[in-house]
A protein has these predicted regions:
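Juxtamembrane "pre-transmembrane" interface segments
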Residues: 204, 443-447, 455-503, 770, ...
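Hydrophobic alpha-helical transmembrane segments of membrane transport and translocation systems
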Residues: 8, 526, 533-534, 570-591, ...
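Non-transmembrane, solvent-exposed regions of membrane trafficking/translocation machinery
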Residues: 22-31, 49, 64-75, 81-428, ...
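Small-residue-enriched core segments of transmembrane alpha-helices in multipass membrane transport
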Residues: 12-15, 430, 517-539, 550-557, ...
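Interfacial segments of transmembrane alpha-helices in multi-pass membrane proteins
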Residues: 2-4, 399-400, 404-419, 423-424, ...
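Interfacial helix-loop-helix hairpins and adjacent transmembrane helices
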Residues: 1-67, 87-128, 156, 635-689, ...
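Pore- and gate-forming transmembrane helices of large, multi-pass membrane proteins
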Residues: 177, 484-504, 556, 574-612, ...
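Cytosolic juxtamembrane regions of multi-pass inner-membrane proteins
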Residues: 552-599, 640-653, 862, 868-930, ...
């Protein structure tokens, strides 16, 4: 074998690297066992802090470097954040109240929901339609974009700047998210920008047990501002005038036909004060309601907002949380713009106010926007440090801040100019505190106080230290997996992997005798070792789908060994010596192995690019496994054989057993003659499946429709039909469903699209609370609180053990990506076969057969949904399975076509039909062996891999069966028909390119 030294050197380096990286996992496990022997928790932590692995690496470094476990194995949280591009544009634009700008933004938002065009392109298109003759520079030649956009800039230049600014905002958001996660203390998080999906950031956080807290941390924009304020006695008269204006019913375009009242005049017309949270009268409920409606009519604003007194500083009023929406319409509407001073801005408090008897009463503050650019005189970018602690006077939790020199100077000037007044500390548009300034504050120190908990101050300090988010980021997809479910997945993964591995070992020995079988099995062991080592070095997390990818790569490795051994057996039957037979067996099998592995790699790369989460985990391990299996099966095993043969050993080695010696040998099936019948059966099956699409359709998961999934573990067996009835009452008007995930009817997946279009961060908690209340009312759960119901560790009484959310924009992109990824896979394989075989007949035959393979798998999911004991929903994992079927199925077709190509080259004058028949018969043993060995693996995953992986395993199992049959009965006959016509045009001459490596 040539390049033997390179092979040995590569093997040694891979072995050393794998040992090094995998050793961190063993070191961490050892230190954990030693620490567990120490009873005192503080002493435990001291021990972990003191250890040094190899004298260099700390325990924390070992944790970060060991092989990571994904969410489905360890439990945790996976989210996809989307940075709002429209919000970035609104921040950059000057004329935000311009009608054309507002209309263009609204139309672009609506179009984005159903278009694959990016938001900037859509906005530019609609702005040109709504403002003909106007240029984008009129909107974006602002102080913020000074030096980048000027009044003379062309639209193309402005568009280029906008795209750069959006990308900068996304990059900054990525940095902020990473900083927040690191400061939160998550071990081995996976944070990455999703390529091809503008503004989306994926965050995987294994081990997270507080999803609500993490949602707030990730979505907070950290836009910290310090504002000057109006005093209450200055602001309240304007609110009274606005109340009068609203009561009179004056519209937005009413001209000033009557002279506006002065604030002092309006002050005389005060409504009767209402006691917050109490009835307005002691009469009946009907009278109370009538009086309240009359009060709202006479005083639309001040019947809901209780104003304060003269000593309230910037606090102008109180209101119940239920009235804030109505008040917002009043204070942010058109009338408010005409009545309130241009520099007045009203903001709510972040938390309910202290000193108010009723609950959920929030304060309204009057902010003074008196800067030329409309920005706060001091912002959070001057904060250099933030610490959580306790106020030394009140003992309440607070956040103290330290500013840089510029911030300290401006803070001193701001406080000096506002002695005796309040300065509002505003974070993300809500007021956290508005303390009175008693004197100039120098040194750049300040504190934020409020109704905080210790956890709130920690998260707030973390958020401030990490910096402000350049634009609001919202969670558009989410998955939460409980740690107990993860432990079960680990057990299932280990069992399925171990059993599949043992069965493959037994199968190889049974088919190819002990020594050849064990050498192939040794290659499998080395393959797994290298795969795990490379995964660890990349710091990639091992997931359940990743284990499935690794198991499937074992099938690919077996395929390579089967090809080599079948070739060696052929050479031995021709009477060649062992040394020559081994050399020619490896040489003749190389091109088929190379082509089949490369086509699988093409599919794996497409899976990785278009997939997210579990699909990427599967693709990663599959790609690494394919590369490792090629190296171990083709090169390392050959080194072993050549070493032994050069020493005069194994000269009489047998590559068969009595059982397999004559298996599928010397067969003369006339497959091409059967093609008419097989085409007929194929068309009938295709029509059945297509008919099923129209009649039954496909059960689409939330990946394609958008919505929320909750996997609920009930205490007692519960029928899905009963849960569905309850869901109709819990989420009226929504599409909801319930599906049993186990045989005991205790684990049920609940799906709903309840308010999935809303971007409010409170909707998730709202949906979970509604679900808890509804199930508890129906007697299906007995948890005492919604917090216990949401805790996956508390199983008694019923609880949510995992959850996921997919927003409508993600669902749209998943649908588009699924179609594109399958089409790209087919086109890529068509082109590769065309380049390698240089004959369009093979490309046409393989592509048509692969399309039928995909159709049959999808058709089975339609035909058998509701029949099998597990879900056959179409989700991202299913699309991954279809692509994997395409990648695997092409292997068999490449092997058959490789033999046809070889025979046509050896016997160019022989009958073309005989050539095809003989080639298929010659590779029949390999086809059966490979398919059977792969089916062994897939059946183990199907029955032992757990509910989450069963649909994938079923799709793959059916795909392997269809793929094997289509290689013989679809791909080859079509290639035969196309090639037969081509040969007729060539007057009997055959042109076949030699594509051997």
């Amino acid at each position: 074998m040539q390049n033997k030294g390179i092979v040995i050197c590569t093997a040694v380096l891979l072995t050393l690297a794998s040992i090094f990286y995998l050793s961190f996992s063993f070191a961490t496990a050892y230190y954990d066992r030693q620490a567990a022997k120490i009873k005192d928790p503080i002493a435990q932590q001291d021990y972990k802090d003191s250890v040094k692995y190899l004298g260099i690496y700390s325990y924390q470094k070992c944790l970060e470097t060991q092989i990571g476990l994904g969410l489905d194995l360890k439990g945790g949280m996976n989210v996809i954040l989307e940075v709002s591009v429209p919000d970035v544009l609104e921040t950059l634009a000057d004329h935000k109240t311009d009608a054309a700008f507002t209309k263009s933004m609204a139309e672009a938002r609506a179009e984005e929901e159903k278009s694959q065009s990016d938001f900037i392109s859509l906005f530019v298109k609609y702005y040109h339609q709504n403002a003909p003759g106007h240029r984008l520079a009129e909107l974006f030649a602002t102080q913020q974009l000074q030096g980048k956009v000027n009044p003379q800039s062309s639209d193309s230049e402005v568009e280029r700047v906008l795209r750069a600014e959006v990308q900068t905002a996304i990059d900054n958001a990525f940095t902020v998210v990473r900083t927040r996660i690191d400061k939160f203390g998550v071990v081995q998080p996976n944070i990455q920008k999703l390529e091809g999906q503008t503004g989306r950031i994926m965050v995987e956080m294994p081990g997270i047990k507080e999803p609500e807290r993490m949602r707030k941390l990730l979505q907070g924009s950290a836009n910290l501002e310090f504002w000057e304020t109006y005093n209450a006695e200055e602001a309240i008269p304007y609110l009274q005038q606005l109340d009068t204006r609203l009561a009179a019913g004056e519209s937005a375009d009413t001209t000033a036909q009557t002279k506006a009242e002065k604030p002092q005049q309006a002050a005389a017309k005060k409504p009767a004060k209402l006691q917050l949270g109490k009835a307005t009268d002691k009469g009946s409920a009907a009278q109370d309601k009538a009086l309240l409606e009359q009060a709202h009519k006479e005083h639309p604003l001040l019947s809901r907002l209780q104003t304060t007194g003269a000593n309230a500083l910037a606090l102008v009023g109180y209101a119940s949380v239920r009235d804030t929406a109505a008040i917002n319409k009043c204070i942010y509407g058109t009338e408010a713009k005409q009545v309130l001073p241009a520099d007045m801005k009203l903001l709510w408090s972040a938390t309910p106010e202290d000193g108010v008897t009723a609950k959920n009463i929030y304060g309204l503050y009057a902010i003074k926007v008196n800067t030329p650019n409309g920005q706060a005189p001091l912002e959070g970018d001057v904060v250099t440090d933030a610490k959580d602690g306790f106020n030394h006077v009140s003992g309440q939790p607070e956040v103290s801040m330290t500013m840089n020199s510029d911030g300290a100077r401006r803070w001193a000037a701001l406080t000096k100019a506002n002695v005796g007044r309040a300065i509002a500390i505003v974070l993300d548009g809500v007021v956290y505190s508005a303390p009175r300034v008693n004197g100039e504050i120098d040194g750049g120190s300040s504190a934020i106080t409020g109704n905080f908990t210790v956890e709130t101050t920690k998260d707030l300090a973390n958020t401030l230290k990490s910096g402000r988010m350049p634009a609001p980021a919202r969670i558009v997809q989410e998955e939460v997996v409980g740690p107990t479910l993860g432990a079960a997945s680990i057990q299932q993964g280990i069992e399925s992997f171990a059993i599949a591995f043992v069965l493959l070992i037994v199968y190889m020995v049974l088919m190819y005798n002990f020594i050849p079988g064990m050498i192939a099995n040794l290659a499998l062991v080395v393959n797994v070792f290298f795969t795990l080592g490379i995964l660890t070095s990349f710091q990639a997390a091992l997931t359940m789908s990743g284990i499935a990818g690794m198991v499937l790569s074992l099938g690919t490795a077996v395929d390579a060994n089967v090809l080599i051994y079948e070739r060696i057996k052929e050479e031995l039957r021709l009477g060649k010596g062992m040394k020559q037979a081994v050399a020619e067996g490896y040489g003749n099998a190389f091109s088929a192995i190379f082509d089949s592995n490369l086509t699988s790699l093409i599919t794996g790369v497409i899976l990785y690019i278009f997939g997210t989460g579990p699909i990427q985990g599967f693709a990663t391990t599959w790609i690494i496994g394919i590369v490792c299996s090629f190296f171990t099966s083709v090169f390392l095993t050959r080194l072993v054989y050549e070493h032994q043969l050069n020493k005069g050993r194994w000269e009489h080695l047998k590559y068969w057993t009595p059982f397999s010696k004559n298996l599928m040998q010397d067969k003369h099936y006339k497959f091409m003659t059967m093609s008419k019948s097989t085409f007929g059966v194929t068309i009938i099956l295709a029509l059945v499946f297509i008919g099923s699409f129209f009649v039954r359709g496909l059960a689409q998961s939330i990946d394609f429709t958008g919505g929320r999934n909750y996997v609920v573990q009930f205490e007692k067996p519960t029928e899905p039909e009963q849960v569905r009835e309850v869901l109709n009452h819990i989420f009226p008007g929504c599409t909801s469903n319930a599906l049993s995930l186990g045989t005991d009817n205790k684990t049920i997946r609940i799906s709903t699209n309840y308010k999935i279009e809303s971007n409010s961060p409170t909707i998730d908690d709202q949906a979970e609370t509604l679900l808890y209340n509804g199930l508890k009312k129906a007697g299906m759960v007995s948890q005492k609180s919604v917090e216990a119901f949401k805790n996956p560790d508390v199983r008694a009484g019923g609880s949510i053990i995992s959850s996921s959310k997919v927003g409508p924009s993600v669902a749209k992109d998943v649908t588009y990506g699924a179609i594109i990824s399958v089409l790209i896979a087919l086109i890529a394989i068509f082109l590769y076969i065309l380049v390698r075989f240089r004959n369009v007949a093979f490309s046409v035959g393989s592509t048509v057969a692969l399309a039928f393979d995909a159709l049959f798998v999808i058709g089975l999911f339609s035909l058998l949904q509701g029949v099998l004991p597990f879900s056959l929903e179409v989700d991202q994992t299913f699309i991954g399975a279809v692509l994997t079927v395409i990648g695997y199925s092409i292997n068999d077709k490449v092997v058959v076509f490789d033999r046809i190509r070889e025979n046509l080259k050896l016997h160019p004058k022989r009958d073309i039909q005989a050539q095809f028949n003989d080639s298929i018969n010659q590779t029949l043993a390999r086809t059966i062996n490979t398919s059977f060995s792969t089916l062994i693996v897939l059946l183990v995953i199907l029955f032992l891999g757990g509910k989450s992986i069963q649909p994938f395993a079923f799709a793959m199992t059916s795909g392997v069966v269809f793929g094997t049959l289509s290689s013989i009965f679809i791909a080859s006959p079509i290639a035969y028909l196309v090639m037969g016509r081509k040969i007729q045009y060539l007057d009997g001459s055959v042109e076949i390119a030699d594509a051997k490596a």
